[in-house]
Each structure stands twice: as C-alpha cells, then as structure tokens.
Amino acid sequence: MEKIDSKICLRCLYDKGIVTFSKKRNPFNHPSVMYRKKDVLKAGNYSDVRYMQDYYLWVDMLIAGMKGYNIQEPLVWMRADSNLFKRRSGKIYVEIQVNLFKKMYKAGYVTYPQYLKSSAIRVCSASAPNWLRQFMFKKVLRK
C-alpha cells in the first residue's frame, strides 16, 4: 500500500501576482482550472506544441488582458513520481520552454534579461540529473 503524503501546495496569487509569477513559472494548476470558452478562443485556443499547452494558453490570455484568480483552497490532490521529473528533461522540452519565453519576450510580456534568465534556468534544469531536478522541484520550487 502506498503511503500518502498530505503536503498541500497552494498558489496564493492574486491578479498582479499572477502576472508577475507567470513571467517565471506556470501560475495555475491545470487540473483545477476553470475558464470561459469564449475567452480561450479569443486568446487563440490551445497551441499545438508538444508540451506546456496550458502555460502557453495562460500566457496568451494574460497578454490579451484577461484576469486570473487562484481559489485559496485545494481542489485537486495530485501525486508526482520520478517519471514526472524525467519528462521535464531533454532537448525537445528545453526548446519548447525557451520558445515560450521567446514568445513572451517578442510580445513585450517579459524583458530581454528576464527571457535570458528564464531560458538559462530551463536549460540547467533539463540538463541536470533526475535526482537533482526532483530535489529542486520538491524543496526549492514547492516550499
């Protein structure tokens, strides 16, 4: 029987905090997102990129001036195993992430230094051994 870790991670972000956070990381937990279909279509719908379609969409919606909100109570319980961290590595994954930040830069959503910093962080993270990436996600990013 699997031991359940009841650690809860909330994204305690509001309007301006969501915009600021989105310039570094995904501001929403996709499984618990609700939105108006007309707003998604207005922002261009989901991209056909291989990974991170949700992050691309949230950025497109925020660039279009739409507002987001994080409900301050957990709605979904999710587990993360080592495969989650393995999927967040490799050349293709880095290219997709860097392209997202390039798109954000070209739209004027992030500055050039923000684009460079975020891209460098993604390259380092995806190049790191799986155990180190897992440690960083659990101990640094989810604190």
Task: Give each language-model segment a name.
Residues 115-122:
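Amphipathic alpha-helical repeat scaffolds of TPR domains
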Residues 2, 6, 10-91:
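Conserved nucleotide-sugar donor-binding catalytic segment
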Residues 122-143:
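Terminal low-complexity segments of carbohydrate-biosynthetic enzymes
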Residues 68-69, 89-90, 106, 125, ...:
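Short alpha-helix boundary/capping motifs
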Residues 78, 86-111:
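Catalytic core of nucleotide-sugar-dependent glycosyltransferases
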